[in-house]
Regions:
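Domain-level signal for soluble alpha/beta catalytic cores
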Residues: 1-331
Length: 331
């Protein structure tokens, strides 16, 4: 409703700002893109606390990775504090961002004077403190609480000789949950995927799922993480249950229970899509084959929800017999 009202009013861009929940950021971005596609730019800024996390626990890199993977045009931070306290968050965001970084601080810290809230940073100091943020690489700059037209005017004057650089493309491969990210380095250590959350051959788990219980799922998740799993595969495929219902339940419960990214594993396209929709981070899809039906639906879903995926060199022609055939099918 908000998106349609703003489109009718003739907006030039959407600024989703002062966000504390990454999942709410995702919801806003999906609402915009499902209403008007990519026709209107989207800027998303979150607010961070002193521990450099949002109120819901998201760190700066995770916010950037998820928002960029979903196709927003710029990402950053606003409100929170004054520009002098934003340096480390900005540096951490810039390390992983390939899109413009937005910075809109408050005019310092609030204080109460004669029953009115004022801010302790005047326009001159605000402009001075914005300079190092621009020099670091922030390219869209403004102000939030306590800033006035004078603050913005002084900032512009102080930055007139600073050239805005187009961010360089970062080669960051990463999965996330709502709070943290897992960088996957092709030259680094293996990231272990725990695959025990699968009812095939596990009668106890099958029975629990038929009773719509998640106790054993949580136990399996915690045990695998304790033994070194960096990613958890989630498969709910068994007879006698509503697989989609149980997949969504498992995703919600595991998101709260463990601090690792999830890998969505189902033979059904609609179940994968629904799980990606509610997952509050950047998930992994296990897997996408080269069969036309899978390519047709799952590649767009991966793009829409920002997911990574495992690509199987398997097509309607059958299993490739050697490396050359695998390369041929993939390319």
């Amino acid at each position: 409703e908000q998106v349609n009202a703003l489109i009718d009013a003739g907006v030039d861009l959407f600024a989703v700002e002062t966000m504390m929940s990454l999942q709410e950021c995702r919801g806003a971005v999906l609402a915009i893109k499902e209403t008007c596609g990519d026709t209107i730019p989207i800027l998303v800024t979150l607010t961070f606390q002193d521990d450099m996390r949002t109120l819901f626990g998201t760190n700066p890199e995770t916010a950037v990775i998820v928002m960029e993977s979903m196709g927003v045009d710029a990402v950053g931070l606003n409100c929170s504090t004054g520009p002098d306290k934003m340096h480390e968050v900005v540096q951490r965001m810039l390390r992983v961002s390939s899109i413009p970084l937005v910075v809109k601080p408050n005019a310092g810290l609030p204080k109460l004077e004669d029953g009115k809230t004022t801010y302790d940073m005047d326009a001159e100091e605000f402009a001075k403190e914005m300079l190092p943020l621009a020099q670091m690489g922030a390219t869209i700059l403004g102000g939030c609480c306590g800033t006035t037209p004078l603050h913005i005017r002084k900032m512009i004057q102080n930055l007139e000789n600073v050239k805005a650089e187009i961010p360089e493309k970062k080669q960051i491969r990463a999965l996330t949950n709502e709070r943290n990210f897992l960088e996957i380095d092709l030259d680094g250590a293996f990231s272990i995927v725990g695959e025990r959350i699968n009812p095939t051959g596990k009668k106890n788990l099958q029975e629990e799922l038929r009773q719509k219980k998640m106790d054993l799922v949580i136990d399996m998740a915690e045990e695998q993480v304790a033994k070194g799993a960096k990613i958890l595969d989630v498969n709910m495929g068994t007879n006698g249950i509503d697989e989609k219902e149980m997949m969504l339940m498992a995703v919600n419960e595991l998101t709260l229970a463990v601090d690792v990214p999830l890998c969505i594993d189902s033979s059904y396209v609609d179940i994968v899509e629904e799980a990606l929709r509610i997952y509050p981070g950047r998930a992994l899809i296990n897997s996408i084959s080269l069969e036309p039906e899978k390519i047709k639906h799952l590649i767009p879903a991966a793009k829409k929800y920002g997911a990574m995926f495992i690509l199987l060199p398997l097509s309607d022609k059958g299993l490739p017999e050697n490396l050359e055939e695998k390369k041929e099918q993939v390319l």
